[in-house]
């Protein structure tokens, strides 16, 4: 995912058990959570004061999540760009409870588009806010762990951490 740097955009780096994350926000809310980004690609930037406040809120929420003290990201101000269909899928992703999984076919049914399984998969893959909009909770119909921006090992770690998969 490419992020266009502007004077209003604020970014920060967050160390997590699954590797470093880069967060980006504008004055409207959090716009991206990126995995292992090259620092030259998205440098840390102060941005606008309101953007920094959104970064602080998101950083605290993610730290609480990884410490086992948060199971939901409700209340965070999100400002991700996407099509109406993508936003519909991302909204449905946000309703998958902590510790549970859903299939792509199940997600398509949830949004009232049962034949749109592939489109749901594509929208899932375009989610700019992984973890916060929990696309890692979507698995294949056969139970297989499929694509994730942070890689399959990170997806497996997150699902085990949430208790959705037995730890091996």
Predicted regions and their residues:
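Basic nucleic-acid-binding alpha-helical/helix-turn surface characteristic of O6-alkylguanine DNA
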Residues: 1-115, 161-168
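Active-site phosphate/pyrophosphate- and oxyanion-stabilizing loops and adjacent acidic/basic residues
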Residues: 60, 121, 156
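Major-groove recognition helix of helix-turn-helix-like DNA-binding domains
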Residues: 93, 118-126
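Histidine- and aromatic-rich ligand-binding microenvironments
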Residues: 97, 128-131
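Short Lys/Arg-enriched helix C-cap and helix-to-coil transition segments
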Residues: 131-138
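…primarily DNA-binding HTH/wHTH and HhH modules…
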Residues: 141-168
């Amino acid at each position: 995912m490419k992020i266009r740097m502007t004077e209003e955009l604020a970014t920060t780096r967050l160390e997590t058990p699954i590797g470093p994350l880069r967060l980006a926000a504008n004055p409207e809310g959090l716009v991206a959570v990126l995995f292992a980004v090259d620092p030259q690609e998205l440098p840390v930037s102060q941005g606008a004061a309101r953007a920094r406040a959104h970064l602080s809120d998101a950083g605290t929420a993610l730290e609480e999540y990884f410490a086992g003290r948060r199971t939901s990201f409700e209340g965070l101000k999100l400002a991700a760009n996407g099509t109406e269909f993508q936003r519909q899928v991302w909204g449905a992703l946000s309703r998958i409870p902590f510790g549970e999984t859903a299939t792509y076919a199940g997600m398509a049914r949830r949004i009232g588009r049962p034949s749109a399984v592939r489109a749901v998969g594509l929208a899932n893959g375009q989610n700019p806010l992984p973890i916060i909009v929990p696309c890692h909770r979507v698995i294949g119909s056969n139970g297989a762990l499929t694509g994730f921006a942070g890689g399959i090992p990170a997806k497996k770690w997150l699902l085990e951490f949430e208790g959705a998969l037995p730890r091996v």
